[in-house]
Regions:
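N-terminal cysteine/histidine-rich coordination modules
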Residues: 229-232
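Interaction interfaces in information-processing and related assembly proteins
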Residues: 1-219
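Conserved small/polar residues in nucleotide/adenosyl-binding loops
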Residues: 220-227
Length: 232
C-alpha cells in the first residue's frame, strides 16, 4: 500500500481527524539511518505523528519540527514535516538495542524521561515553540498530552510500527482525532467510549485496514474528504 494521509470531519464540525499509512516513509528512514528495530519503531512513530501534524499547517511554506529529547539510550529524535505531507527525521543513536519488556519493544525505556518540543516556523520573526514533558515516552501519549496542554485541543493519538522478522518495516501508520470547540458533552462521551473500544494501530494495520477504515471504526460518520500522498 502506498503511503498517504486522509483528513476527515464529522458531526457538523464537532470533530476532525487524520489517519495515515507510512510504511514507505519509515522503511526509507530505516535504510537511510541503518536503525535497529527499536529505533525504527520509535522514529517511525514520531515520523507518522509529525506527518499528520504537518498537514495541519496552513501555508505551503510553513515548516513543523517535532523533537524528543530524553535521557534514554536512543538519544534525541528530530523530525521535520511540511503541509504537503513530506516528512523526514533522524535519531541520535540509531543502533540502540534493549531487551524486550513484557514481550514488547521497550520504547519508553529507549526514550527515557525528557521533553517533547514542537516548533512551528510560519514565517514570523520567531517560530512558535511548545514544550511539554514526556508523560509515557511512548510518543503517541506524549503527542496527545502536547495537544491538550500546549494547543488546548482535546485529542487522541494512535501510532504504530510493525516489523518483519528480517527487521524491515511490515506496516506503519496512525491517527489523530481532535475535538473542536463546538463539541457537545453528549458527543464527547460517545466518541471517547468508541475510541476506548478500538484495537491498537498495529493490530488494525496488521489486519489490512486502510486509513479510511481506521477512521470509520474510530467514529462511524468520519469520512475522508482529502487525501495527501507522496510523503517521502
Amino acid at each position: 500500500m502506498k503511503d498517504y494521509i486522509v483528513r476527515a470531519t464529522a458531526a457538523n464540525g464537532q470533530v476532525r481527524a487524520f489517519a495515515a499509512t507510512t510504511r514507505g516513509v519509515v522503511e526509507t528512514a530505516r535504510k537511510d539511518h541503518n536503525t535497529s528495530p527499536i529505533a525504527t519503531v520509535a522514529l517511525g512513530r514520531l515520523l507518522t505523528g509529525a506527518a499528520m501534524m504537518g498537514i495541519m499547517m496552513k501555508n505551503d511554506s510553513d515548516i513543523l519540527t517535532v523533537q524528543i529529547k530524553g535521557n534514554g539510550p536512543i538519544g534525541a529524535m528530530t523530525v521535520t514535516a511540511e503541509p504537503n505531507g513530506h516528512v523526514k527525521g533522524f535519531v541520535a543513536n540509531p543502533e540502540v538495542m534493549l531487551p524486550l519488556k513484557n514481550g514488547h519493544m521497550d520504547i519508553a525505556g529507549a526514550v527515557g524521561i525528557g521533553v517533547l518540543s514542537v516548533i512551528k516556523d510560519i514565517g514570523l520573526r520567531e517560530p512558535y515553540v511548545g514544550d511539554t514533558i514526556l508523560i509515557t515516552s511512548e510518543i503517541a501519549d506524549d503527542l496527545t498530552y502536547y495537544f491538550a496542554t500546549s494547543e488546548q485541543v482535546p485529542s487522541s493519538v494512535g501510532l504504530g510500527v510493525l516489523m518483519n522478522k528480517d527487521n524491515t518495516v511490515r506496516e506503519a501508520g496512525g491517527f489523530i482525532i481532535q475535538l473542536m470547540p463546538n463539541a457537545t458533552d453528549e458527543f464527547i462521551d460517545k466518541l471517547e467510549k468508541r475510541i476506548k473500544e478500538i484495537k491498537s494501530v498495529t493490530n488494525m494495520l496488521d489486519e489490512g485496514m486502510t486509513p479510511e477504515d481506521i477512521l470509520a471504526v474510530s467514529y462511524t460518520h468520519l469520512r475522508a474528504h482529502e487525501t495527501l500522498s507522496d510523503l517521502v
